[in-house]
C-alpha cells in the first residue's frame, strides 16, 4: 500500500522499509504553543496531485489540535468537544480548500453507491439554495465547463459577506449531509476546519440555533490548516487563494475537474507545504511572544 502513495505520513516506529525504492523521508519539528510537534513524511520519486498532500495535512492538523487542547486543559479551560458531538455540525457553515475538495471527491466516490449518491444529492440541493442567496447579494459569473457543457456558478466571498452568509445558513437549520444518526461518516477524513473547531466552556455547546448572533468562545488557534492548503494551491497553480463551502464542493468540482488532475513532483508539493506551515507557525509564535511581552509591560506599569 505504501508503495502506491506518492506522499505518506509515517509513524515514529516506521523506518524506511515500508516505502520501497526511490523515496525520500522528510522530517520536521514545530514549536506549537511551546510544545514540540513532529511529523515524518515519506515522499516517492513520482508525480502527485494536490489531493495527495491532504492526508498529511489532516494528521498534522490533528496533532496541533491535540497540543492546543492539552495547553487549554493545563490552564484549567474546559473543552467539551469530543467525537460523537454534532452540535456545531448542525449549523456551522464549513469552508474547505481546493486540495480538500479534490480529496473529498475521491473519498466520497469510494463509499457505497447509495450513500455516495445521497451525500452528493444533499450537498447539491443545499448548494442551489446557497447560490440563490448569493445571487441576491453578491456579484457572480457563469463559467462553462468544457467537459460537461454545464453551467457552474463561481463566486468568492470574504469578510462581512461571509459572515452574512453564515448567519443566513444558521437560520436554515440544515444538518451536515455527512452526518448519519448524529455521527460523522467521514470523521477520520473530515475537513481541517471541522477538526480544528474547538469551543471553550463549562458545558456542552448545545444552544438555540435560532440565535444566529450568538458568539461562542473559540480559542485562538496556532494555525489554520485550511489557510496553509489555500496558500499551497495558490502557490503551485498561480491562482488566487480559494475556499469553497463544503456543501458546494461537488458542484464546484464539476467545473474544475482538469485542475484536480494537474501534477507536480511529490517532493515539490511536500516541501512547499512544510515550508508554508513552518512560516505560519513561526509567525504565530512571534505574535504570541509580542502579546506576552505587551501584557507583561502593561502589568509592570500598573
What do these predicted regions represent?
Residues 1-302:
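Short loop/turn segments that flank or connect secondary-structure elements
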Amino acid at each position: 500500500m505504501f508503495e502506491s502513495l506518492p506522499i505518506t505520513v509515517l509513524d515514529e516506529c516506521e523506518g524506511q522499509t515500508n516505502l520501497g525504492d526511490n523515496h525520500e523521508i522528510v522530517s520536521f519539528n514545530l514549536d506549537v504553543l511551546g510544545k514540540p510537534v513532529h511529523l515524518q513524511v515519506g515522499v516517492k520519486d513520482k508525480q502527485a496531485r494536490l489531493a495527495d498532500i491532504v492526508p498529511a495535512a489532516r494528521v498534522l492538523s490533528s496533532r496541533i489540535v491535540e497540543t492546543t487542547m492539552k495547553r487549554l486543559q493545563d490552564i484549567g479551560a474546559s473543552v467539551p468537544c469530543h467525537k460523537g458531538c454534532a452540535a456545531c455540525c448542525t449549523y456551522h457553515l464549513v469552508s474547505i480548500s481546493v486540495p480538500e475538495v479534490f480529496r473529498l471527491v475521491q473519498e466520497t466516490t469510494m463509499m457505497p453507491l447509495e450513500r455516495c449518491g445521497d451525500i452528493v444529492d444533499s450537498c447539491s440541493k443545499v448548494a442551489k439554495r446557497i447560490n440563490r442567496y448569493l445571487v441576491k447579494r453578491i456579484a457572480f459569473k457563469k463559467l462553462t465547463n468544457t467537459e460537461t457543457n454545464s453551467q457552474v456558478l463561481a463566486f468568492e466571498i470574504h469578510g462581512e459577506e461571509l459572515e452574512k452568509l453564515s448567519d443566513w445558513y444558521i437560520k436554515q437549520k440544515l444538518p451536515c449531509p455527512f452526518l448519519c444518526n448524529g455521527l460523522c461518516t467521514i470523521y477520520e477524513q473530515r475537513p481541517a476546519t471541522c477538526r480544528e473547531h474547538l469551543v471553550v466552556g463549562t458545558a456542552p455547546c448545545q444552544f438555540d440555533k435560532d440565535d444566529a448572533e450568538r458568539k461562542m468562545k473559540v480559542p485562538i488557534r496556532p494555525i489554520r490548516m485550511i489557510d496553509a492548503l489555500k496558500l499551497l494551491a495558490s502557490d503551485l497553480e498561480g491562482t488566487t487563494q480559494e475556499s469553497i463551502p463544503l456543501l458546494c464542493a461537488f458542484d464546484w468540482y464539476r467545473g474544475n475537474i482538469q485542475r484536480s488532475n494537474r501534477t507536480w513532483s511529490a517532493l515539490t508539493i511536500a516541501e512547499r507545504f512544510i515550508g508554508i506551515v513552518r512560516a505560519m507557525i513561526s509567525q504565530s509564535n512571534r505574535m504570541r511572544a509580542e502579546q506576552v511581552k505587551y501584557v507583561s509591560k502593561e502589568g509592570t506599569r500598573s
